[in-house]
Amino acid sequence: MGFEALSRGASHVTFVDKDRSCASAIKQSARQFKLEADSYEMISADFEKALSFFSRQGTSFDIIFVDPPYKMHLGGKIVQIVQTGRLLSNRGLLIVEHLPNELLDKIEVESYPQDSKLVPIDQRRYGSTSLTIFANALTVEE
């Protein structure tokens, strides 16, 4: 997805994968695509460590796309970490890929401050895969 985003005009993509062989494959693909070094970064880390790092740095993203291992049912946890870490820009989108039976639209968000609350705005199913898209609650209300 990151390479597709770059090909469609994204100025920068941050890849996160804890599997070193996947990280290596991403770097190799970037070289093959002749990407500018400042257009992407590859972080080899567990998603929780990476998101915590971004939060401490005050980094926010316009789009966060996550494709966690389905069997681990991490979608809800990721939404909560993105909310509490304030990792989305005001008009940003969080897109979570997950199993259709993982109900991410039912995540409890009432306890989060209004300016960091994420709400589901769309859900799509593609065969055995679902995508749930979240946005900042204040943006949705405008």
Annotate each predicted stretch with a short phrase.
Residues M1-E142:
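Class I S-adenosyl-L-methionine-dependent methyltransferase catalytic core
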